[in-house]
Amino acid sequence: MIFMVDVSEILAKMKPLLGMSADEEFANPEQAEASANLAIKTSQVEDVDIIAILACYYYTESRDMKTDENVSVMANHFYRMYQIAIEEAKQKELNEEEGAVFFD
């Protein structure tokens, strides 16, 4: 699966949440990921998969690996990770409603 994303449109929604101007760049991949997480938590961006892609876009860019193929590979990796995390959260919530006890 290959993702095509208009990163600038997503950035327009995310940067103001961090008090960044439109022309500022993220300092590192951690800042991009933090911005993505904040955007998700505040419901400023609806599609968690696109946020994952954006985070990996900056991950690859910061490491001089920004090619379409690398971004696509990382996007698929993040996509799978987010899907697994979402499913695990749903299952845990369902189990807690049924009275199951978890030990982390």
Curated annotation (Swiss-Prot):
Q: Which domain of life is it from?
A: Archaea
State the protein's name: Uncharacterized protein MJ0338
